[in-house]
Amino acid sequence: DIEAPEGRRWSSSWVRELLAAGDVAGAARVLGHLHRIRGTVCHGFKRGRTLGFPTANLSEDVEGVIPADGVYAGWVVRAVPGTQSAEFLPAAISVGTNPQFNGEQRTVEAHVLGRSDLNLYGERIAVTFVSRIRPMLSFGSLDGLLTQMDDDLRQTASVLGIGVTGRVDPDSVTAR
């Protein structure tokens, strides 16, 4: 048996336990690489777009273990059309039921930082998790949610080591 420095045996059960707790960084240490899920981008409720944070929503055909509800820093990985190359796009990833909007269905949505021009509908993408930013929360107001989302983007940029980006276009918020 191979044991980790903590004395625990490396196992897929350990990885699933870490993911269930939202510890994607711990899962990456056990796996030896970042945890990734795959799915097809589908149409959602377009709430993110109306708030100035367009998202790529994964359909229910997700491959891989979805981590605990929360907001994560990570990457959207897509095939570059017409090539054999992959494009890694920095992303703030939301996993959960969207309690702010009384959501019932658990979803995975990724907002690509600094990009509002992407049309990923129908594409099969990978979502790679680097670090958990925070648990899923409900806020008292739309402004509270928007302020937190801006902070989530800044934290995501910091974790990923890229330039700080705020909301795509604050004037585009149509949900007020």
State where each predicted segment sits.
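General secondary-structure edge motif
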Residues: 7, 38, 125-129
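Hydrophobic alpha-helical segments and helix-packing faces
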Residues: 8, 20, 34, 51, ...
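Charge-rich, low-complexity N-terminal segments
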Residues: 26-31, 37, 42
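Phosphate/ribose-recognition catalytic cores of enzymes acting on nucleotide-derived substrates
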Residues: 44-176
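Basic side chains
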Residues: 9, 16, 36, 47-49, ...
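Residue-level detector of secondary-structure transition/capping positions
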Residues: 34-35, 153
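Contiguous mid-protein beta-loop-alpha structural module that forms a pocket-lining wall or clamp
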Residues: 1-30
